[in-house]
């Protein structure tokens, strides 16, 4: 996993382009100290970053394959397709996205079908567990429950059907909001900006926030909004959620911290995530300076080749790629 992360950081340096020093926020992330070796999230991040690099280099089939492989480890790399779909719809260039989607489906099936055929019960255990389990300790639902005594949407035993539906609907509404924003914005949003919003909505609304999930947010946030103090503060607060939760679970008899203290840390973490998302929205709407665009003559370094960064990209005129590819011109009315 350590070697995989080193390679991931090297690819992030490629994607950071002319802001290569922002890569230090990824390499030295406080979240990495606590969660790097928890579960299989590092490989999924590796495949997601590799997919973004492949898409930047116009290798859309490869990008799709990598997204499918990443999704075989963890669900979140599939969220990248939402970002690329938004850009594809805005540009009316669906062919690159279609290749990515097809390759992602095929590669995911290539990994999962043999496992399913060998042991279908084991293959479906993840879905069963996530369907049947209730909310996790550090979600907004758990915080509301501890503060108000609320017992949840569902009553009795069995799968939390209403909770599952509510979390899914809230996430889908968030994705729809990202799509509308991406289509209506004055200039095509950058891929990292869209990914930040999609992943952010998933983290905030999902009924499970395993501590290592926060690692998913690190690289998109660094590439979308390289505000060092804000990101380092968020990562430091987020890093504290897990040890504070463990401390709380020790119980009052063993000097564990009270529930209100855990709630404060969780609310602070969520507030930072939401603040980052709000700033990204303001950036997309042109109400905040975009340091990444400024450093690349208006281009999105995740959608354009380094050779293209030398020439300014006019806000009111399309670029002229030599082949069909995602670019960053405004939407055509």
Model-derived segments and spans:
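Transmembrane helices and adjacent periplasmic/lumenal helix-loop junctions
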Residues: 40-42, 65-87, 110, 204-213
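Specific aromatic-rich, kink-prone transmembrane helix
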Residues: 44-60, 199
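Multi-pass, polyprenyl lipid-linked donor-dependent membrane glycosyltransferases
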Residues: 3, 24-28, 32-50, 73, ...
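Perimembrane helix-loop-helix junctions
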Residues: 79-106, 117
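Transmembrane-helix motifs of polytopic, lipid-linked glycan transferases
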Residues: 1-19, 24, 48, 173-181
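Aromatic-enriched
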Residues: 233-333
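Aromatic/glycine/proline-enriched transmembrane-helix motif characteristic
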Residues: 134, 140-204, 288-333
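Extracytoplasmic catalytic-loop and juxtamembrane helix elements of membrane-embedded
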Residues: 115-145
């Amino acid at each position: 996993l350590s070697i995989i992360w080193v390679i991931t950081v090297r690819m992030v340096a490629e994607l950071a382009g002319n802001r290569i020093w922002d890569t230090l926020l990824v390499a030295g992330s406080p979240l990495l100290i606590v969660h790097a070796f928890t579960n299989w999230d590092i490989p999924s991040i590796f495949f997601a970053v590799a997919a973004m690099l492949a898409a930047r280099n116009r290798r859309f089939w490869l990008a799709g394959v990598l997204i499918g492989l990443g999704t075989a480890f963890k669900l979140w790399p599939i969220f990248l397709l939402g970002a690329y779909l938004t850009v594809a719809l805005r540009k009316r260039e669906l062919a690159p996205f279609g290749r990515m989607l097809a390759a992602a489906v095929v590669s995911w099936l290539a990994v999962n079908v043999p496992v399913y055929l060998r042991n279908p019960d084991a293959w479906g255990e993840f879905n069963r567990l996530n369907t049947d389990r209730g909310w996790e300790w550090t979600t907004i639902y758990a915080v509301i429950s501890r503060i108000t005594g609320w017992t949840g949407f569902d009553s009795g035993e069995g799968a939390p059907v209403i909770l599952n539906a509510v979390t899914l609907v809230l996430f889908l509404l968030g994705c729809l909001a990202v799509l509308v924003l991406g289509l209506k914005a004055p200039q095509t949003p950058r891929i990292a900006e869209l990914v930040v919003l999609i992943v952010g909505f998933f983290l905030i609304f999902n009924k499970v926030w395993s501590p290592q999930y926060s690692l998913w947010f690190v690289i998109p946030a660094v590439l979308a909004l390289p505000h060092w103090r804000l990101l380092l503060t968020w990562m430091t607060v987020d890093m504290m959620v897990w040890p504070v939760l463990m401390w709380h679970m020790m119980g009052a008899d063993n000097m564990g911290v009270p529930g209100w203290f855990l709630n404060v840390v969780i609310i602070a973490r969520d507030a930072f995530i939401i603040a980052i998302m709000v700033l990204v929205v303001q950036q997309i709407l042109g109400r905040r300076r975009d340091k990444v665009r400024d450093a690349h003559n208006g281009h999105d370094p995740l959608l354009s080749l380094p050779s293209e960064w030398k020439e300014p990209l006019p806000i009111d005129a399309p670029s002229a790629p030599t082949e069909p590819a995602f670019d960053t011109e405004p939407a055509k009315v």
